[in-house]
Amino acid sequence: SGKVINKLKDRMPNLIGGSADLAPSNKTNMSDAGDFSKADYAGRNMHFGVRELAMTAIGNGMMLHGGLRTYVSTFFVFSDYTKPMARLSALMKMPLTFVFTHDSIGVGEDGPTHEPIEQLAMFRAMPNFHVFRPCDATETAAAWYSAVTSKTTPTALVLSRQNLAPMPGSCKDALKGGYVIDDCEGTPDLILI
């Protein structure tokens, strides 16, 4: 995702975004884009602090103002704090992009307080809200493409903490949603969805 953001910043001069005090972990900093501040309104990296709700409200406001394409980011387990404003994004048909990271049981020593369980179901249940949980870098790039080309629908990119190996066949149908990555002959022993 971080590589995609840095490719997009060169093609989208109106791209601006940031994280709730987790940019190095979320990989959401745009290199050589400066930090938005009182001294530098041209900076494109926003530092929201530990304020997920305010971050999302600010992202909505920037999108409502027009002219900017905005993304916000935090750990997926903290997405609960973004929910009221994320719902307003959907209701207002505001195509804000959410980058939620660390969706994995491999999140490390922080234990269950940092393990998102119900958040994916919550966002998937929200009307007019796209949710992508890409399996690799190819699907992540496709999810970003869908997010930045959306005109009326907010998008959540739900990403793992770990680097993931490319999946064979993940490219062709990545924008379709669910699809078969690896089929078998005969009756399968297991179907993994």
Descriptions of predicted regions:
Residues S1-V158, N163-A165, A174:
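Thiamine diphosphate
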Residues K151-T153, D173-I193:
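Long hydrophobic segments that form regular secondary structure
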